[in-house]
Structure formats: C-alpha cells, structure tokens
C-alpha cells in the first residue's frame, strides 16, 4: 500500500512540476473600492438618458460665480456657518469655487496657454483651476522642468482672475511617504524636489499669494505600482497625517503661506474624509479635506451614518462627506468625473446632478477631471478616434472659445454646471453632407412627369436628349417671384412616377435649366409625401440671363436652386423621419420669352445622419493566455474603451501562423500625448497574476503602406489594471520599433517585418489579480500606416528562473511527501 502511495505521489509531483514551468499562477482577491454598504440607502446608478430635474435639484441653477473671484473675494478662509465649517472670502462670506482640473501636465501640458485659461475664466465662468503635477508616471521625478508648467499655470490663473490649486498628484504609488515623493536626483542627474521642499519653494516664489491653494496629496491609496500603498483604515489615515502635518507646519512657519488654504487627501483615493474627521485631524486653522468621486461608480445618498458606526462600515462616499461635515471639517471636491472611476463608460449625468446639487447646497467647492482630449468619458474635449473624430486643440485660438462641438459630452455638461445654467446638449448625431439625383432622365423617358391636371395651360412634355423638355410656355409668363404670382404658370408633376425617394435631411432642391437663348425662368416647387401632401410654395425662384452659360452644343444652361424657405414642404418632408419618402413633386414653370425649356438632374442636397459601416470583427472567442489564435478566434482580445483605433480585428496568416491583425494609421498632426492616437488592445483574463513570470513576449509583424514607415517609432507599452492597485500597473520598460531602421528588421517569407517583443514585468506585484493585460502602440512622431499582426502572446521567464521555480517546487513537494509519509506510519 505504501509503495503504491509513493508511486501516486511521484506521478502527482511530476505533473505539478511540469505545470509549474508553464503556468505559475495563483488566485488573488479583487480589491474592494468600498462604495457599497447597507447602513445608508444609496441612490441607484443607472446608465440612461439625462433628464434635468431642477425642481428636485434647484442648487444646480444659481447663475454662476462671476463676482466670486480673487479680485473681489480676496484671501480665502474657513468659517463656521450654522455649525458647518465652510470656505469663505476675505470678509467671511461663504464662497464656492467651481472649475476644472488639468490632466497630468506631463501628458497634456499644452492646456497651459493664455487662450485656454481665458476661455475657462470667461466663457466657462470658472473661478478656480487645478494644476495636476504627477510625480511618477514619467512626470516630475523624471522631468523636473515640469515645474515650469506649474509656474506658467499660476501666472495665467492670476492674469485671468482665478484661484489656482497646486496639486502634488500622489497616484502611483499610493503612499505619500514613498521614496519617489521624497525628492533627490533622477537617473539623468537632475535634481527634483520632494513634497515639503516643493511646496516651500512655491510658497517662497509666491509668498502669501491669496490666489494659491496647496493640495498636498491627490489620492492616497493602496496603489502599489512603483512603491508602497496605504490601507483603507485608521492606519492609512495616520500614514497620510504623518506625511501632511510636517508640510503644513513648514508652510505656516515659513511665513510665506500663513493663511493659504491647504487641502489634504485621505485613504482609498480620497474617499475617506470620515477618517480624517475623526480623532486625529490635521492641526491647522485653514486645512480642508479632499473629496474625490466618479458618478458612475460612487452612489449618492440622502442619508447620513447613524452615530456609533465603526469606520470599517462606512463605505458610501457621499455619506462619508456628510460625516466629515457633521464633525466640523471642511471639504473640497478637487476631482470628480461623470464616468466610472477608471475614467470610462457613461456619462452618468443624472447621478452627476445628484452629486452637484449636494455640493452646491453645502457650499462645497469643486474642480472637474479633466482638461484633456484623451479618449475617455471624463475628458472635457473631443478625442482623436481614427475615422471618427479629430482631437480638439487645447488652445482654443484667439477668440478664446471652444465651440460646443469641440467639447465632449462631459465638457459640455460641466461647463453648464460651472455657469449655473440649464444644461442644453447639442445634437451629437454624426452627420454627413449628401447630394443625390432623383430624376436624371437618362433612360429616355419622362420618369413619370406629366402635365398636372390643374395646370391652367397645356404643354407638351417629352424626353429629348436625356432631359425633360417642356414645350408650350409662351403664355406662362408670371416671373415676379411672389407667391400669388406663380399660380398662373404651367404646372407639371411626377404623377406617374412609381417610386419614392427618402429625402430625410434635405435642405435644397436643384435642377439644371437648359434653353436655346438666355432668358428669365421662374420655378416654384411643392414636393409631396404621403405624410405631407401639400404646403404652398412661398415664392418662385428666378434665374436670369446672366446665370446661363453657353454649352458645346450651342444651348445655354443654368442651375436653379430651391431652398426650404422657398418650398416649405421640402422642409416638412425632410425633417420628418416618419414621412420623409418623397413620392411626387409639383413644379410651377414660367419664362419671360421662351416657349421651350428643358430640365435635368433634379437633385436634393443636404445634411443627414451618418450611419457608418459596421466594423466586422472576427469571433472574439474565449480568453486565452498564451494567445496563439490557432482556433481562428481572437481568444478574448478586444479594443480597450480608450483606444483611438477601432478598426476590424481579424485573424490573418503571418509567417505561416494565425495572428491577430488590424489596419491603422497615425495622424499627421500630433497631440502632445503620444498615447492619444494609439491602438489599445486588451485581454481580460480571470485569475491573472504575475507569479514568477518575468516578461511578456509576443511576435509582432508590420506590413506598412509604401513610404508610410520611414520616420519616428512605434513604442509598445504594457499595462495591467489590477483593482487592488487603482486599476493601473505599468511595466517600466517599453519596446521600440524604430521605423528609420526598418531595413535592419527580420523579413519573413511573406514579406512582413518581424519583431520578437519582450517587455519586462518584474516591477509588477506578483500576488495580486491583474484583471487584464493591455498593449498600447504609441505614436512617437511616426508616419506609420498599414497592417500589423500580433501572435504568440505569453507570459514567460528566463531559463534560470525556470530552474529556480522547478527546484523550489521540488523542495515543496518533497516536504509534502515527508508529511504524508509521516501520517502513513
């Protein structure tokens, strides 16, 4: 029996060892963002059309903030009003600040320009702007010159009479005490300031400037990308406090920021003001606490927490804000969006109304995230999407106004809420101009045109030289153009036309008029449909001798155009989706001295909804990693919601193997963020963790259009989105395809340029659920256009590591075997 057991264990050990080399994955729990509990009743989040309810949410309409600016309000302070601490002006009168936050200045720094700040102050009615200075994520630590953007933003805010929040954008990692926030010298030998020195430096440069508000820690959180995170509890708040209190004290003691407002974040992405408001707040007279929320993730509530509720049971963000207010703490919503917490989906505008009504009612100041043309719901401007839209320029131009079409739905909505006016969205239906000939007479017939039965004069109608010739117009001479004038003219109509034509969106009706000698011709029109049979023409439209041009055959031709004002029934039909099928038209035709004229190419032109051809992807299939695509499916790969490219994902052959393929091109006009125009592919995979893997590898092939891969580079970035790390964990390495060195690439038998890509992932935590893997093909000043192929995507490790893993697992299994044998004795 014992020998059989040994053999069984040996077999199991062998199987486990083999498995360990190829799939060292473990299950991990998803992080809890903490926004649901049963202690308060949440207001349900629903993705549905927006309906403003100003009777229910009257605080949305307050007429704006025109007089509540630094030039009038002066230095800010905190006062107590009816038991609630709130922001006030220099005279102690409560003041609310409303405006926008920039996105990361390292990515979208071009928003810092005179025209943009003027637009925000004047056209948007903002009295505050927030400057988001990231530290990691290729920002201030790696490019200390970004501080110049902060200086420029401060100056522009002052010039445009706005308060300005200097945001030390703690994000990745989530512990503000992490080494990256301590300052030092970067890899290029450049010195960058730590948090305390940074704020002291700004205060010294702008001593006691009433415009300035200092935000010390954007979002403390459990995010462990690039360093440690903090816990969502009292210990997490204590970590924030231990970071913030010395900076607050240093600013006050410096004499350069004696009374400036300071804002401090809280654990769980600044959703735990309740922790900050408890037993150990910041010791300061002018400190506020940060509130962050996204209306597609964080539910509102009409309730507050009952007394005695423990901190671990407080998870509704709005209730946390109410808790802080009840405890006498002032809060400032320095970041919020109409999307879900990751910046996508929605927009959730009904929920935004709930939140903004709460903020406005309680005089809580706010800045919206964010001033970017990035392809995410929370961005304020129209993004670049290949074949769909061009990115809005972050400099609005000398008129200092962005048109509504240049704003995203979020931007349009937030602008109205800053202004305190009704939100009236524009029609964003994609439209296209069109021009279509209805009657061309090229078939040798009159195409249904006959003398109308009510015509006061008789004429002959026939097809001559593929045009509709009308003979007998000698006495049809009413050419004054007024409505009462055309009734005496000849009437023709398409009574025998047996077709219909959809003219939805038509704005004009035009036709060629051909005569033997130039003259004046007058035509009035009454288009007809089954739903709109009659509406008198307002007038005839005239063309005169000067409008005609001689043709090669000696005749003369002019174009006569009838608008909806001339023919109201044209508009009636063209604007009725249920009655837009044209089935007849009556024309009243008069001439000054011509007996015969010909009509040709009767055409409608206008503007109608554009219905793009649907993108046909190959079958998605089940998520698989490794991904070899040999089953003919995409094995779960899809476009990320922020991808600027959404062309067809198909399975094609590359180098003798199935591969995932798509076509795309980078635009000639480049945004400052090279990710803004990038294809973004993502794969969601259950229980995806790094484990012992060291890199992600895949085969990448490119097949460029001729002369469209000659300059710049394609930079391949690798991202995971673990919930427990703030949905963002980026591999520090990238893989560059230098298009100027394309000739040195391996070329396959089928003529493709082949790259064996490896991206190191050892800086990604190895024991948390990663949720999804994303590949971003960024545009580094590239002219690339063509087709690309992706194959054999896998997580892998070096041979040395495989040996180490094998040895470790052998040891573990041997220990287990000893334990089993001991039990058998």
Curated annotation (Swiss-Prot):
Keywords, alphabetical: Carbohydrate metabolism, Cellulose degradation, Glycosidase, Hydrolase, Polysaccharide degradation, Signal
Residues of the signal peptide: 1-28
Record InterPro entries: CBM17/28 (IPR005086), Galactose-bd-like_sf (IPR008979), Glyco_hydro_5 (IPR001547), Glyco_hydro_5_CS (IPR018087), Glycoside_hydrolase_SF (IPR017853)
Family: Belongs to the glycosyl hydrolase 5 (cellulase A) family.
Recorded catalytic activity of this chain's protein: Endohydrolysis of (1->4)-beta-D-glucosidic linkages in cellulose, lichenin and cereal beta-D-glucans
UniProt cross-references to Gene3D superfamilies, sorted A to Z: Galactose-binding domain-like, Glycosidases
Region called Disordered, residue ranges: 607-635
Gene name tied to this protein: celC
A single MF term (Gene Ontology): cellulase activity
Name assigned to this protein: Endoglucanase C
Biased amino acid composition, Basic and acidic residues: 607-621
EC number annotated for this UniProt entry: 3.2.1.4
Active site as annotated: 219, 335
Domain of life: Bacteria
UniProt KW Isomerase keyword: no
GO biological process: cellulose catabolic process
Enzyme class: hydrolase
